[in-house]
């Protein structure tokens, strides 16, 4: 092992001596006090040292998942996601709050129905999941405006600064959401253990003071005023030391940062660039914040995908099970004490809530799919890691050392980072020195153990590390009082039951492994063939060697049964904590010990004992053998999803049964055959259209970043329109000298726009992911002098920009018309009107929120909601597969019934066909029961399949689907195909409660 650098050694020595440390880092002066108890704490429930948090006095590794409930607007499904997180072996969830969804109008905070947070907090509490609250006010999150409401574009001050106008604007939101979070803190019996002020406060420019200690202290104090007393934690965008403990005003209690080491090149999922695996984060942590636990508040487990990208399945491959094995185990080598994976469940950018850099799906290539399915192997791999950490309290007591490729192996092709314990177990994280290597490399280990330095395997043969894999080898590992002297196979879990101990080990295909137990007991093979297993007593330890096989084998040494599994078999094992019928305890040492091991395939949600009955709730996607290992002594009967299951008990005490799988026949309607009704949703292009009720575009802008180049503002947010399609009408009197019209529109990446002159189509910008704005020039027909004409302009607002760099105020980039020029005229010759969603910030549909609707005629009238007035004379029978024969926008709606059998979780998608080459330029908005659940851009993509969850879809009744079809080319547009399809039905214990689906009602004052 190489010696620590002089500075690091001195730092550690000073810590040990209890000396306060002062040092310089990146321009900051950092003063670290080594004793966390001497910091002023506002509560006693959550404390910490340099290794981990303590919750109620018990040391705990926080292994968490990032999920955003607001990206799944069906609160009853939040429990489903949280159960799937708990089943990973995780104990925590980190979440953002999207301010834009809660305060669509300044001063009016609304958090009801799908926007209420109480069901989420209650579910986390019921399931024993701690929460890290990250309400911003700025969140980034690939959300429109980075979570900022659009009305901040009118703010006369710099966002995320100490400008009083900005601070005042945040008060209503923070007082409400902060107050609610405060009620659910651990101090009040709730699940919230940490609070993050702001997010990624890591970069500034343009003359703004950065970092600004006054600003950040205000954000912290603001939370404290709302009642927040749990420790604060930061999320620096890189380990830059911003607001670290000891930096003075604006410092947080616990420093953390994020990291997305493999990046976002989903088009090349097999490419792992040289140098992308972090190796120095432990050293950086010791420089920045040595007396707090190392915290990775966001660590990559998926990737975002832009408009025109390769799609999220490619992102899932980029950050798949191999990525998890190498990169996540690498984080363990740093001694990470707080780790949250972004995104463990991504969800959907429904209702225009996404930023312009992404499309409707926010699947993120996550372990839990957008559809809530857990069929990606990366979910199962993550479960192995989560349960290992949950079973290994000694990990937090081990001290990380320096990586080396010579000390612990016999080959320089491999690198090992040790975490050395002092009687509490040691961990050796092994990977290829070239982390991207796909070679299979044989090796031997040289490990320091309590029995001395050992060369492993001791019984002959060789270990092997396959390509893009990593191992955590163990030394002096405690299993309920039995010492595992070493294990080359990896631990999934272990438990002490009333009739003995169980240790579950696994290995990859083609691997050879060896285990030594400090015991003089004999080895018995109690299940499976013993011919592939060898053993020997060596200096007071039983050494067992085996080759990994698909068939399970169980070896018994004294009162310890060791399950030898291959990795794919281990994927089918679950370790639910025993709870009650309605709740699961938090992952305390006692609660973790009170768990059972279940082999059951797709998903095990909960386990509890009621009287003499052991109850499991579980999901199945195939006929599945179910085994219970370590059934409680008091249990006699087995119930699965409330039904008694006949079971047998073998000689090893394992309960066995089988759950059948007979999926129901699912008959979905053929969308092409529905009784579609349509209406022109762009009547504004007709010269006779009366726009007198529309707002006049007569304001000067309040935008402080983008000065006007037009006589009056044509920035939509100046008038309260922040979401969806925007419409402008410009009136002028011709003088006969008009020859062309130039217009610069801006809607964000991949936006589109179209222009008409008094019913004559002039042209469109069809969109490109590389363009946020576009300047087009259109040739005009001959105009008659003295006659009134009107331009009609449609702009697709793809969401507001995020606001990452302080001082740029990127979220203030306007949407609408930036500039225009009509030949032969002054700009002031044109008088403009505009509209967006009906009511703007006084939006009508409070159930579906402030961003759900855009400015099209049908949207303004609410025709996208169930039961629109299709019998009026303006409607005709027409389908989107017939479409339009010329440029324009039509609206189509139809109803259909579903009858999905209860007890089955069935993913359902709306799928658009795209078979024409080159792809015609048209845009579609998909509404389901009034909720906007898709923006489809045919000529850009990539998304063609749009999942809609149960709860938005009525699985047992009538549903309404609506689409807007915008033809941006002279030949018009029609859908190639439009289908309703389903995924694999899962037999489930899940119970889904639908959300409110308000019907169409005539809107007062609508135009």
From Swiss-Prot:
Residues bearing glycans: 156, 405, 422, 621, 740, 775, 914
Binding site for substrate: 96, 140-142, 199, 260, 364
Alphabetical UniProt keywords: Carbohydrate metabolism, Disulfide bond, Glycoprotein, Glycosidase, Hydrolase, Polysaccharide degradation, Secreted, Signal
Gene3D superfamilies xref list: Beta-galactosidase, domain 2, Beta-galactosidase, domain 3, Galactose-binding domain-like, Glycosidases
Any one biological process term the GO annotation gives: polysaccharide catabolic process
EC identifiers of the protein: 3.2.1.23
Active site: 200 (proton donor), 298 (nucleophile)
Cell location: Secreted
Catalytic reactions of this protein: Hydrolysis of terminal non-reducing beta-D-galactose residues in beta-D-galactosides
GO cellular component: extracellular region; vacuole
Cysteines paired by S-S bonds: 205-206, 266-315
Secretion signal span: 1-18
SUPFAM superfamilies documented for this protein: (Trans)glycosidases, Beta-galactosidase LacA, domain 3, Galactose-binding domain-like, Glycosyl hydrolase domain
Pfam families: BetaGal_ABD2, BetaGal_dom2, BetaGal_dom3, Glyco_hydro_35
Gene Ontology molecular function terms on file: beta-galactosidase activity
Primary enzyme class: hydrolase
Family per record: Belongs to the glycosyl hydrolase 35 family.
Protein task: Cleaves beta-linked terminal galactosyl residues from gangliosides, glycoproteins, and glycosaminoglycans.
Listed name of the protein: Probable beta-galactosidase A
Source species: Emericella nidulans (strain FGSC A4 / ATCC 38163 / CBS 112.46 / NRRL 194 / M139) (Aspergillus nidulans)
